[in-house]
Amino acid sequence: MECDLMETDILESLEDLGYKGPLLDDGALLQAVSAGAASPEFTKLCAWLVSELRVLCKLEENVQATNSPSEAEEFQLEVSGLLGEMNCPYPSLTSGDVTKRLLVEKNCLLLLTYLISELEAARMLCVNAPPKKAQEGGGSEVFQELKGICIALGMSKPPANITMFQFFSGIEKKLKETLAKVPPNHVGKPLLKKPMGPAHWEKIEAINQAIANEYEVRRKLLIKRLDVTVQSFGWSDRAKSQTDKLAKVYQPKRSLLSPKGKVSVAHLLAARQDLSKILRTSSGSIREKTACAINKVLMGRVPDRGGRPNEIEPPPPEMPPWQKRQDGPQQQAGGRGGGRGGYEHSSYGGRGGHEQGGRGGRGSYDHGGRGGGRGNKHQGGWTDGGSGSGGGYQDGAYRDSGFQPGGYHGGHSGGYQAGGYGGFQTSSYTGSGYQGGGYQQDNRYQDGGHHGERGSGRGGRGGRGGRGGRGSQGGGWGGRGSQTYHQGGQFEQHFQHGGYQYSHSGFGQGRHYTS
């Protein structure tokens, strides 16, 4: 049923296309397609459709009709190449075994349908295409140029049997006769004197094409500017009523402006040496002769708008001017932190070490004074006797008490608690502690020590905010001051509220080594 419908459509289309072959008879088409490529009548119909297509389309492949079934394989190869060039969309005609594609009746009908549709489309495009402009006077472009030369030189029409050599010899002779009648420098010497070969002419043509493309862009830009400028004049209410008059005047002149130039290699051959003279159009002497009154009428005098670099004021600074940094109010060393601070080096067992930190009630901690018999400092005050929380004398030794928040702490939270010390049990004191990130150390002799000694050496270094310096490694032994060697004693180390606290217990008969 499907094949019958396809046959009917094919027969109607063949009649419309002007086919006059034998396959228009009843049953002839079905008999031909049933044999496929082995039928000479089928191959002749395909060859006729392809020949009509080649007239309208640029096809390289061609199909020849067969005279016998033995040529069917060659015919199918030709059809395969043609369909590949035409980008046939039917897979059954472009895939599979080439020698067996057109042996199927349905594929043969599909091939005829495809070729007929392509031919119909090509003819419709040809009819709807705009007709080519006929050249004035007839003939090719070269003929028109030669005809113009003959007319300009006043030559008669050459005979029909003249050769090209004779024709150009006649033109050369006529040119010499014409040049003899004018002054010697009337035409001038040519600008291009060197002979050129085919390779040179190709390069010259390429250069000319590149320059032509560049100037075409410039011409389009200028024409677009002109269109926009003229269009802007029509924006006013007064000009809107004159739109038709403006278009009637502007459009004829606008149509004469072509974006493509007409300069060719022929203009290079016709160029004379007078074109190589370079004239300065901006010099005063030239402008005196070339200036016209229209320039002043159009422009007139305009006010000076400035803009000269030497007259422009410098821009304001992007950043505000820097001011000298002002020092803050002087305060006592202490509080929290305080860096390294300073340290006093004393040569006696009185004050020594750092004055840094904060006392319980003051902003600084004066860790000094003489020991012996007066107890210790506790939260900024003196108390009689010693205690575990506040420190104090223990068997005659001075123990450290510290600040309540952030300094020496005798058993309360914050900073190194109770510092660390290692000194004479009964005659010297070495305290180490943290005060808000700074390290404090006080080394001194107590009463009962050797005062003839050198103070207690150096006080510990002011530490950086996490280390106790050399004087106290993490709250350990105190500084480089006087060290005490004990025999028969032991340390008890324990933590209280996040800090270190060292207490000496069980020191028996400590012996002091001094210089």
Curated annotation (Swiss-Prot):
Pfam families: DUF2465. Residues 502-515 have a biased composition (Polar residues). Signal peptide: none annotated. Coiled coil: none annotated. Residues 297-410, 432-515 are annotated as: Disordered. One of its GO terms (molecular function) is protein methyltransferase activity. Residues 485-501 have a biased composition (Low complexity). One of its GO terms (biological process) is positive regulation of ruffle assembly. Residues 382-394, 457-481 have a biased composition (Gly residues). Positively stimulates PRMT1-induced protein arginine methylation. Involved in skeletal homeostasis. Positively regulates lysosome peripheral distribution and ruffled border formation in osteoclasts. Interacts (via N- and C-terminus) with DDX1. Interacts (via N- and C-terminus) with C14orf166. Interacts with FAM98B. Interacts with PLEKHM1 (via N- and C-terminus). Belongs to the FAM98 family. This is Protein FAM98A. It comes from Mus musculus (Mouse). The gene is Fam98a.
